[in-house]
Amino acid sequence: MFKVLPFTAIVHPNAITAPRLVVKMSAIATKNAVESFVVKPPAHPTYDLKGVIQLALSEDAGDIGDVTCKATIPIDMESEAHFLAKEDGIVAGIALAEMIFAEVDPSLKMEWSINDGDKVHKGLKFGKVQGKAHSIVIAERVVLNFMQRMSGIATLTKAMADAAHPATILETRKTAPGLRLVDKWAVLIGGGKNHRMGLFDMVMIKDNHISAAGGVSKALNSVDQYLEQNKLQMGVEVETRTIAEVHEVLEYASQTKTSLTRIMLDNMVVPLSNGDIEVSMLEEAVDLINGRFETEASGNVTLETVHKIGQTGVTYISSGALTHSVKALDISLKIDTELALEVGRRTKRA
């Protein structure tokens, strides 16, 4: 299941001199691990979680590894560290943490009292990792970086998904570069749904496409021709910004066989000076479409406004705030000091 390969970018905790080795899971082992997840990560055609993990470990390790660990921690010291929630929220990233620990040192053992997507309260110890102190400390920051970000996304997603009901909450492509898989996975864990993964899995006709094509109808017609010529089948969404554009889309669809599946209603939620929002334009657009296509509200979506937007009858509500500026959930990983000291004393006596 496992094989040892040379990998110069990642430093194994026990490797002090070159060549450095890292234990890597086989493709079958990776697939089996993913299948066991409570919430499975979304798929991507050109990269996967292994690549994300290896890049994160590589940028941390540099070319010689953790010099502080080598200087301060006996290489054979065994220890135990606990995950502590320092504020209330939804935890996400447990499955990814296990993959990271396994990448650093497959001998590490983990135990959890919760699953991805569960709520934690401040002060709760919800997991522990046991094994070589070197390995735990080397993996610590990478694990926490992912878990804190993912948990922050999942926490906000859960709150917005609950408030948006019966509409479904979606994220956007406004994700951290290189972390789209992870960010979108966190949205799923928090109870949201994924919008398109990238530029390749859905046609999304936005304002710039419409301007370049010469109008909404021309853009839609070009997309229909392109998909037919290339024998492609995928979702098609078009952005509308006014009621007139909604009429134009519906007129086009009534006269032409189209691949259109969803109409985005962009910035049809108007913020008011008193902090409330006006949704009459959005309601009018939803009534016009009358279930012929999926609808997606976008723009001025916050935790405070999403409930009112969700009551208009839209199918989806998309929010870039879920991923582009989310607050990380405060989580720590602390080594059991007494256990470490006792192991250290035994090591010295030996």
Swiss-Prot record:
Keywords: Alkaloid metabolism, Glycosyltransferase, Pyridine nucleotide biosynthesis, Transferase. Pathway: Alkaloid biosynthesis; nicotine biosynthesis; Cofactor biosynthesis; NAD(+) biosynthesis; nicotinate D-ribonucleotide from quinolinate: step 1/1. It comes from the Eukaryota. GO terms for cellular component: cytoplasm. Substrate binds at residues 141, 172-174, 196, 206, 239, 266, 298-300, 319-321. SUPFAM superfamilies: Nicotinate/Quinolinate PRTase C-terminal domain-like, Nicotinate/Quinolinate PRTase N-terminal domain-like. Belongs to the NadC/ModD family. This is Quinolinate phosphoribosyltransferase [decarboxylating] 1b. It comes from Nicotiana tabacum. The lineage of its organism: Eukaryota, Viridiplantae, Streptophyta, Embryophyta, Tracheophyta.
